[in-house]
């Protein structure tokens, strides 16, 4: 089972620490968080991309994906006026360009909250318009775009497997895929494996965390309530061959290396010996 480190937890340290830790601790790849100060797409365009490419080479660490910050600060393609929407889409396009240049396997985005007063027809119309434009760009440059469903604490747009199916049906692009952060279905009493059943080969990536079942908090494996050992057995038996990013975000920023080590060790302990 291939593992990825998410760099968001290292945001108060130089990004080289994330590459170094991923290499030394034994992660198989790295998922780059696209927020300041590390890898904000406009900063990469201004020259920072050279450092990212150099670090990947120095530490021999594959960049499995690039995840620009699209959940509302300051970019959210689902909320605000046309100027705000246009800025968000332009940033995501730039992020795809930067992902292409750093040889990332995908660009991962989400449909953040569309606002409490926005009716469903407006939400889905805006999502379809956004994804159509982004997928056309992705097809033109040869970049896979992954749409991540969020928890209902974070969004009111794409939050479950059926929402993903709806989005994929609205924009049937060969470059559009989805994934599952296993916290999202768990807090909604939705079976994680239903994503595998419903999405098939459109399921491109996994974020592995533990969950308390009552919030969007991402815990290290073993700190929450999820039956992770049994879940990973099912995922392996289903034949999943992609990466599993152990997605530690802001909860563990005070000691990212220590928690990244602990998270990886606990995750691997969940797996059969031949998958570790």
Curated annotation (Swiss-Prot):
Residues involved in a divalent metal cation binding: 148, 181, 207, 247
Tree of life domain: Bacteria
InterPro entries (UniProt xref): IolE/XylAMocC-like, Xyl_isomerase-like_sf, Xyl_isomerase-like_TIM-brl
Cofactor(s) of this protein: Ni(2+); Co(2+)
EC number of this enzyme: 5.1.3.41
Induction field: Induced by psicoselysine. Makes part of the frl operon with FrlA, FrlB, FrlD and FrlR.
Record keywords, A-Z: Cobalt, Isomerase, Metal-binding, Nickel
Enzyme class name: isomerase
Pfam families in UniProt: AP_endonuc_2
Catalysed conversion reaction: N(6)-(D-psicosyl)-L-lysine = N(6)-(D-fructosyl)-L-lysine
GO biological process, one term: amino sugar catabolic process
Record comment: activity regulation: Inhibited by Zn(2+).
GO MF: identical protein binding; metal ion binding; racemase and epimerase activity, acting on carbohydrates and derivatives
List of catalytic residues: 148 (proton donor/acceptor), 247 (proton donor/acceptor)
Cofactor: binding comment: Can use Ni(2+) or Co(2+) in vitro, and, to a lesser extent, Fe(2+) or Mn(2+), but not Ca(2+) or Cu(2+).
Membership in a protein family: Belongs to the FrlC family.
Main function: Allows E.coli to utilize psicoselysine for growth. Does not act on psicose or fructoselysine 6-phosphate.
Protein name, UniProt field: Fructoselysine 3-epimerase
């Amino acid at each position: 089972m291939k593992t990825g480190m998410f760099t968001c937890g290292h945001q108060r340290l130089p990004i080289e620490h994330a590459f170094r830790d991923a290499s030394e601790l034994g992660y198989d790849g790295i998922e780059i968080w696209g927020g300041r100060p590390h890898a904000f797409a406009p900063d990469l365009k201004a020259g920072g991309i050279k450092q990212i490419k150099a670090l990947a080479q120095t530490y021999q660490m594959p960049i499995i994906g690039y995840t620009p910050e699209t959940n509302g600060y300051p970019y959210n393609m689902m909320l605000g006026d046309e100027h705000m929407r246009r800025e968000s889409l332009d940033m995501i396009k730039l992020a795809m360009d930067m992902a292409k240049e750093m040889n990332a396997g995908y660009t991962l985005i989400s449909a953040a909250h569309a606002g409490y007063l926005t009716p469903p027809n407006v939400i889905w119309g805006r999502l379809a318009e956004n994804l159509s434009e982004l997928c056309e760009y992705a097809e033109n440059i040869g970049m896979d775009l992954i749409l991540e469903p969020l928890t209902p604490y974070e969004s009111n747009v794409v939050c479950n497997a059926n929402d993903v199916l709806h989005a994929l049906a609205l924009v049937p692009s060969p470059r559009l895929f989805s994934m599952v952060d296993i916290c999202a279905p768990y807090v909604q009493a939705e079976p994680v494996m239903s994503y595998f059943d419903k999405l098939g080969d459109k399921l491109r990536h996994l974020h592995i965390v533990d969950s308390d079942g009552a919030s969007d908090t991402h815990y290290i494996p073993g700190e929450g309530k999820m039956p992770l050992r049994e879940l990973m057995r099912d995922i392996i038996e289903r034949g999943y061959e992609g990466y599993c990013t152990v997605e530690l975000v802001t909860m563990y920023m005070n000691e990212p290396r220590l928690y990244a080590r602990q998270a990886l060790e606990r995750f691997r302990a969940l797996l059969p010996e031949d998958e570790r």
